[in-house]
Amino acid sequence: MKFIKKLISIFVNNQTLFRNLFAIFLYKLNLIPDEYKGRVNSIYKKQQYEKKFLKFNLKYNDLGFYYLDPIPTKVFLNKYYEEIYWQSRGDKNYPIRLRDIEHYKLLKKIYPDFDKDSKKVLNFGAGHGGLSILLYVANHKIYNFDFGQTNNLFSERWNQVNDLCKIDSKFDLIYGSHSLEHVQNIKEIMKKFDEISHENTIYFFEVPNCINSKKIVPPHTYYFTRKFFYNYFEKYDYCETLDNSGIKKNDEGVVIRFLSKSRVKKNLLK
């Protein structure tokens, strides 16, 4: 009986993995229904890409992060995100998640006056666009950056950005939820953030906490600790690691949440 319970537990905890393996098996035998072929093809290609990720090495930088070595090229990553990442997932059309609500509540708690007037917001790696929608409803101007493009939900104050180099204005909030770990060059990204920020810009990031991680998790290219945020910003207003229930865990939480109304340290941008 214990063996049966263990098998059931393994299956329940890995439902997505087993479902994808079965779908790929049917796909290879040309038995998958036509309406699912595109999705399963993307899942299959994603697995092939992930094998390539696992061939890289993981190195540590004293500024507080691990990174893939050699870092994948921009062409490699762009193709992956444009053609495979979102196509292999089914959650982009579920725009509001508990995490988005938690982020909005924390933003309002740390900066109570944030909604008093309309702000210009960059959602970096916007994906499903959860916080973008909440801030849009609060009358802010939204700019969504994502290789896979966020759903075009509104006709005003809702903008799609596909190239950071084309941005030349300043933002009041630069936000990224589980996106910094996907970039190709963190120094270039932080330099660009500094260029499009002003002295009162709020930075809000959430990333996986990798202080004890020595394992590559495709398609992540960077693996952060809180030390990264302490090193890169002049000060911070909130920097905690949290478990899956949102409870603070010193350095042992599964994610890092960081908020700061300060500048990126100039000496790190040279």
Listing of model-derived features with the role each one plays in the protein:
Residues 3-169, 173-177, 186-190, 226, ...:
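Conserved N-terminal segment of class I S-adenosyl-L-methionine
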Residues 140, 198-201:
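A short helix->loop->beta-strand "cap" motif at the edges of active sites that frequently abuts
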Residues 178, 182, 220:
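Histidine-centered divalent metal-coordination motifs
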Residues 208-214, 222-223:
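Short "lid" loop at the C-terminus of a central beta-strand within the Rossmann-like core
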